[in-house]
Each structure stands twice: as structure tokens, then as C-alpha cells.
């Protein structure tokens, strides 16, 4: 037969597959452990051998910057450049890439190039930044793996500033891309621009650092669109502080960024199509297609306001402050219907972005006027008005901080434009200036530590307290620097200050004796000794359980000074809860259940679910009659079906386990303990370590996970 059926040549596989409900849909309150397995090698196309730092070193940065300079004025018909220069657009792209950073948990920021992915690529505040990245694609394509998207977006912001006459403070590469969206709590709202993140009298929930869902910081029209500059100033101060910026840095950033470019509110926002993630397949990831006029150039709609701040929007100047203070301002609305302000009785002195024959009167956003009508901001703004050189220096430094805040210590910085000056927000650690200890010294020091009278619990808890401050999000914290001996960490409740002071005193004595006794420049830092003492404690506990092991130790840490430590900044690292130590603060408001806080801290420590599980089991001194022995007793006794658990009426969050037959109390535990028997995935892992043949595996896995935490901030070892 040669008769063709109607289905000839068609794929035999049905493509309309019903979409089922996920486990999260069925059980929305279920503890999410999958966040511990983000950005695995399974999603990375580069392979294990790829080393971005080595690739970046091959980059001809000067050639790349020349290409970026040329791009600034190569206007494209599909997205024309305002004033013939893309500088303002690229500054906004870089700002919004970095500006998601929040100091409370160190998440967000420019470090992974997350602006490429949902939800950030579709936030209302990031409207039309997809065009900025598409303009960059030919350059990214040319330089390939030698420059990540994360680095390229920040570098392009720098080049934009430089191409418009501004002297930047510097640039460091080293931001490696990831290849999937980051699962991150951006707020509880289910709609864009929702603001269900407040409690009490407009108290913003932690760790959030923006006032509404889908905004970087604040609503430029004012709180919830209310055009009140003074009220807006309060929200600016709160959100910028949560991004680690003080008042001077805040003023400099707002004024500096608004020295260039314009906003786009040419028409009613109803003309705008879906965002990139909601667009049609033929749109190829471009969103916000507008049917207003041409949809681009003079007809572009990005947000609501239609504002140009400066008489020279493609050149660095002091016009922002001159206009801010030289005029009185009256409320008006943009063509899009958004609140904005125009100068009273002012001549038309602001150029049009696309018609050289047109001029406009100066305009400002509500949040711009905050810099004049808030008394603290006004004082700073007037100083910058009268001292343009101070303004330029403050903006250069604040911009560098904004774009590098989440990169961690300077040892991670790459490239020829890294500033020589050390800045306190970089959590400076001095270079090691002495000969390091060798294997014989390590053995000798372990012996002295174990003979000092300090218990296994004291040694292990002190090392954990020192190292577990590390945050993989912004690469802060960790054992290097020994900042556990400095304020504020030495006084944190979770660190048991009285015990900590005693342990540190003993270790400092051992350190002093060793350093005094050795000639030839050999020394051990307290940072190294704290970790070494913890290793000695783990080894002793393992030996007591019948396992003769050696915990890996690599010296090379240094001790930071008080002068190198911003105590206020480090206060953000204090845990509200630490499930590894069964700690929940009673004096600070909790935003998560204890078990959620445990997973959150594990994710900050870059731990996997198995690593989380084995560490909790090893660090516990509950569910065992051998508290200073490294055993799997925690898992064995937790999973014992001879025990029945019930909440204690007099202690919230505490449970008692009774013998099912005698009803006698055998154990007490917390939600963090019991989650390893309740949560199906964690229970599966607990069963591995509770098995009769798992004792050796448990010890080996614990030591590996312990060492990972101790070395989490050792970027010099990578």
C-alpha cells in the first residue's frame, strides 16, 4: 500500500502530558531538603575539570573592555539606546544584579549571574533588563568561558560608568556562573508587588531586604505608591541597611546611579505583554513586549515614571544634587499615570532621549526627594552638593562595595583592576607571615590540648562555633581569622560565652608556649589551633568508640584584629537558631521552625542532606549514655520502635520519649532531633547510619563532613 495516512510523518509520542501535583503541592508545609542539592554537577555543562578562575586568567581584559566601550554607543533598532548611549541601561543591569544582596543571610547578589533565571529575570523591577543581556550576548559569545555572565554584567556596569567620564574604584573577577535558578525565599506573596512581608507597625520580616515582591529595594513612587518622600526615606534606610549600606553610601548610590540615563513610562502599563518567563516560545526569552506606539525608544514602557535627572545624562556631573536643591518640586504624573515630581517654574533644560530639538523640565522620583527632605540624608546630600570630589569618591567606593559585597575575602578577587586598598567590609584577614607547623608539631600540639583538662565537648563545640559561622552565600564567616575571640562573636549566647572564654584562655596559653619555644619563625595561629583542638577532640571521641582515625588538618589560617573587624557587620552572622547545637534563641524573634532553620544553616554551610544528617548525629549528646564518644547511638535510639514520643506540655518544642511497655521516660528531644525520624527523606538517611554495619561508615562520613566545615573558608586551598 502506498496510501498515506493522515498521521504519516508525525511523532508517535503524545506531547500533551498532564501535569501532576508535586509533593510540595500536596504537603506545602513539608520540610524542603531539596535546597541542599542545588547547583550539583548534574546541571553544570562545564564538567568537573573546568576551573573558572584559570579561564579568567586567560582573558584579555583590556580587549574586552574596548569591545564594551564600543557597544555603549552602537544603538540597535530593536532596542534603541537612550541619548545614543546604553550606559544608563547597563548601570541598572549591574545594580540590579548586585542589589538583591541581603546581609541577614548573605544570599542574593551578583555572584552567580542569577539575573538570567526566574524569578529575577521576570521581576517587575527588572523589566527590560533582558534587552541589556541580549545586547551583551555577542560579546559573551566572543569571549566564551573566559568571562562568566556574573562577571560580565558587573564589568559592563563599570565600563558604562567609565565611558561616561566616571573613575571607578576597581573591578574584581571571580564570579562563577551557575546553571539553574536558585531556590530562595524572596517573600510570602503570591502576586507581583505584594507586601505581605510586614508585621506590627510596618516591621519588615527577615531576611528580606525589599519592600515589595519583585522590587530590588523600594517603590520609587513611595511606600505602596504613596508619594511621601519622608516616609520613603524610612523604607530606603531600612532596605539599604539590610544590604549592608550606611546612610552616606545610600545617598551616594542613589544620586550616583541617577546621574545617568532615564526611566521609561511613555504610556499606560496595560500595553505591556508578559514577562520573559510567561512569554510565548517564539519570543525566545524576551519579555515585556509593548504595543504602545513602536514599543521601543521614545515609546518604551519599563515601569511607571518618566524621569530624566540630569542635563547631561551620559556624562558624570553634579547635576542631580544641583537640581534637587535648586528647585522646589510639585507632584505630577507620568504618561503612564505614575507619581513623580517636576521642578516648579523651571526652564526646559533636560534633553530628550530621542529628539535633539526637544527639552524637558527637570523631574525627580519620590525616592530622590527623600535625599532632600530626610534630615540625615539632606545633610549628606548638601555636603556632596558643595564637595563634588567627596561625592565622586563616595559613589566609587559604594559602587565597588555594592558590586563586590558577596564575593568574600580578597583572596578570591581576580584580575589586574583589583584595588590595593583593604576595606573593612571585606573582612580582612592578614597574610600568614610565619613558618607553618609540620606533622610532628601537630601531634605535639594535639597531645598538649588533650592534656589541658578541656573536655571533648569543649574542644568540639569551640571549633564548631568558630567554623560554622561560614556562609557559602557571601563567603563570610568561618574559622579563618579566629574572630570567635572578638566582639560580637565572643558574646553570642549560642557560643556559651563563659565556657568559650575559658576554652580560649587555655588554647591561648598553649599557643603562647608553642610560639615562644620555637625559633626560626615557626608559629601557630589561634585560628589554626582552635580547629586543631577540635580535630583532637573528634579523634579522642572516635577512639573511645573503637575507631582509630586521623582528622585531616591543614595549617595556614591567620588571626584577624579588632581593627580589621566591623563588629556591627558581623552581628548579622549571629544565628537565631543552630540545630547542630540544638540551640534556639528565646530573646530573638524566630521566622522559621527549628528544623527549617537547621536546613537553612546547612545550606549556608554548603552541606548536602547526608552531610547534614551525619553531622547532627555526631554532634549530638542526646539519645546516648556515652556523650563523649563518637557513635551512631543518636540514630539507633531515635529509630527504636520501643520508644513512643509525645510533646511536653511545660516545654514548647521539646518532646519526651517513653518506653512503650513501661512508659518510663527514656529520652527528651527537640523538633530538630525528631525530624530525622519524621521526615521521610531524612529518615531514610538516618536508617543508613543506624544500621548495625554502619558504625565505621558513620565515623568516616562524620570526619569528612566535619573537615568540610572546618575548611569551608579556606579559599587558598581551592
Curated annotation (Swiss-Prot):
Protein keywords: Heme, Hydrogen peroxide, Iron, Metal-binding, Oxidoreductase, Peroxidase, Plasmid
CDD domains registered for this protein in UniProt: catalase_peroxidase_1 (cd00649), catalase_peroxidase_2 (cd08200)
Cross-link (Tryptophyl-tyrosyl-methioninium (Trp-Tyr) (with M-243)): 95-217
Binding site for heme b: 258
Site (Transition state stabilizer): 92
Active site: 96
Disulfide bonds: none
Top-rank lineage group of the source organism: Bacteria
Coiled-coil spans in chain: none
EC numbers, comma separated: 1.11.1.21
Transmembrane segments: none
InterPro entries on file: Catalase_peroxidase, Haem_peroxidase, Haem_peroxidase_sf, Peroxidases_AS, Peroxidases_heam-ligand_BS
GO molecular function: catalase activity; heme binding; metal ion binding
Subunit architecture: Homodimer or homotetramer.
Function: Bifunctional enzyme with both catalase and broad-spectrum peroxidase activity.
Family assignment from sequence similarity: Belongs to the peroxidase family. Peroxidase/catalase subfamily.
Protein name: Catalase-peroxidase
Taxonomic path: Bacteria, Pseudomonadati, Pseudomonadota, Alphaproteobacteria, Hyphomicrobiales
Amino acid at each position: 500500500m502506498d496510501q498515506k495516512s493522515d498521521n504519516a510523518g508525525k511523532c508517535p509520542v503524545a506531547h500533551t502530558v498532564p501535569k501532576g501535583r508535586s509533593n510540595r503541592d500536596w504537603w506545602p508545609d513539608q520540610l524542603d531538603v531539596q535546597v541542599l542539592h542545588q547547583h550539583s554537577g548534574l546541571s553544570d555543562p562545564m564538567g568537573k575539570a573546568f576551573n573558572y578562575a584559570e579561564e579568567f586568567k586567560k582573558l584579555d581584559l583590556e580587549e574586552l573592555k574596548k569591545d564594551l566601550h564600543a557597544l555603549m554607543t552602537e544603538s540597535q533598532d530593536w532596542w534603541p539606546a537612550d541619548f545614543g548611549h546604553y550606559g544608563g541601561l547597563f548601570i541598572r543591569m549591574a545594580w540590579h544584579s548586585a542589589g538583591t544582596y541581603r546581609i541577614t543571610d548573605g544570599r542574593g547578589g551578583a555572584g552567580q549571574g542569577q539575573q538570567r533565571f526566574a524569578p529575577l529575570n521576570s521581576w517587575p523591577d527588572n523589566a527590560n533588563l533582558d534587552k541589556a543581556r541580549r545586547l551583551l550576548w555577542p560579546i559573551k559569545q566572543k569571549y566564551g568561558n573566559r568571562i562568566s555572565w556574573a562577571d560580565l554584567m558587573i564589568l559592563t556596569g563599570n565600563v558604562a560608568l567609565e565611558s561616561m567620564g566616571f573613575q571607578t574604584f576597581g573591578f574584581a573577577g571571580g564570579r562563577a556562573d551557575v546553571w539553574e535558578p536558585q531556590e530562595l525565599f524572596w517573600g510570602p506573596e503570591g502576586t507581583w508587588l505584594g507586601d505581605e512581608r510586614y508585621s506590627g507597625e510596618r516591621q519588615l520580616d527577615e531576611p528580606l531586604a525589599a519592600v515589595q515582591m519583585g522590587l530590588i529595594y523600594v517603590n520609587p513612587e513611595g511606600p505602596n505608591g504613596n508619594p511621601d518622600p519622608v516616609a520613603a526615606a524610612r523604607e530606603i534606610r531600612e532596605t539599604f541597611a539590610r544590604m549592608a549600606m550606611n546612610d552616606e553610601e545610600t545617598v551616594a548610590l542613589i544620586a550616583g546611579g541617577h546621574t545617568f540615563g532615564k526611566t521609561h513610562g511613555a504610556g499606560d502599563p496595560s500595553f505591556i505583554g508578559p514577562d520573559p518567563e510567561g512569554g510565548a516560545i517564539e519570543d525566545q526569552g524576551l519579555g515585556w513586549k509593548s504595543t504602545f506606539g513602536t514599543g521601543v525608544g521614545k515609546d518604551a514602557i519599563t515601569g511607571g515614571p518618566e524621569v530624566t535627572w540630569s542635563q547631561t545624562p551620559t556624562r558624570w556631573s553634579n547635576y542631580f544634587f544641583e537640581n534637587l536643591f535648586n528647585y522646589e518640586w510639585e507632584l505630577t504624573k507620568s504618561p503612564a499615570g505614575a507619581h513623580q515630581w517636576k521642578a516648579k517654574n523651571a526652564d526646559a533644560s533636560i534633553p530628550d532621549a530621542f529628539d535633539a530639538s526637544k527639552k524637558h523640565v527637570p523631574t525627580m522620583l519620590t525616592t530622590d526627594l527623600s535625599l532632600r527632605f530626610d534630615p540625615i540624608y539632606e545633610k549628606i546630600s548638601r555636603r556632596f552638593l558643595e564637595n563634588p570630589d567627596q561625592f565622586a569618591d563616595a559613589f566609587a567606593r559604594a559602587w565597588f562595595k555594592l558590586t563586590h559585597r558577596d564575593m568574600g575575602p580578597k583572596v578570591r578577587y581576580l584580575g589586574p583592576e583589583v584595588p590595593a586598598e583593604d576595606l573593612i567590609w571585606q573582612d580582612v584577614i592578614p597574610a600568614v607571615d610565619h613558618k607553618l607547623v609540620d606533622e610532628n608539631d601537630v601531634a605535639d600540639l594535639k597531645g598538649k590540648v588533650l592534656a589541658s583538662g578541656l573536655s571533648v565537648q569543649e574542644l568540639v563545640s569551640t571549633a564548631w562555633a568558630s567554623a560554622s559561622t561560614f556562609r557559602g552565600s557571601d563567603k563570610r564567616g568561618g574559622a579563618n581569622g579566629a574572630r570567635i575571640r572578638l566582639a560580637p562573636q565572643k558574646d553570642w549566647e549560642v557560643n556559651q560565652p563563659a565556657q568559650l572564654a575559658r576554652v580560649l584562655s587555655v588554647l591561648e596559653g598553649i599557643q603562647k608556649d608553642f610560639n615562644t619555644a620555637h625559633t626560626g619563625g615557626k608559629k601557630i595561629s589561634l585560628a589554626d589551633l582552635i580547629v586543631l583542638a577540635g580535630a583532637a577532640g573528634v579523634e579522642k571521641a572516635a577512639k573511645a568508640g573503637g575507631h582509630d582515625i586521623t582528622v585531616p588538618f591543614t595549617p595556614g589560617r591567620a588571626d584577624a584584629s579588632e581593627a580589621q573587624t566591623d563588629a556591627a557587620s558581623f552581628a548579622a552572622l549571629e544565628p537565631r537558631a543552630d540545630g547542630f547545637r540544638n540551640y534556639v534563641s528565646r530573646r530573638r524573634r524566630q521566622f522559621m521552625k527549628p528544623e527549617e532553620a537547621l536546613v537553612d544553616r546547612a545550606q549556608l554551610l554548603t552541606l548536602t542532606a547526608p552531610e547534614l544528617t551525619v553531622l547532627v548525629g555526631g554532634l549530638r549528646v542526646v539519645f546516648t549514655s556515652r556523650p563523649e564518644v563518637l557513635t551512631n547511638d543518636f540514630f539507633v535510639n531515635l529509630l527504636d520502635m520501643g520508644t513512643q514520643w509525645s510533646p511536653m506540655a511545660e516545654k514548647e518544642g521539646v518532646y519526651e520519649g517513653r518506653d512503650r511497655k513501661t512508659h518510663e521516660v527514656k529520652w527528651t528531644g527537640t523538633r530538630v532531633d525528631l525530624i530525622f525520624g519524621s521526615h521521610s527523606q531524612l529518615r531514610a538517611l538516618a536508617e543508613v547510619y543506624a544500621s548495625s554495619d554502619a558504625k565505621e561508615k558513620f565515623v568516616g562520613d562524620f570526619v569528612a563532613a566535619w573537615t568540610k566545615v572546618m575548611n569551608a573558608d579556606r579559599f587558598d586551598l581551592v
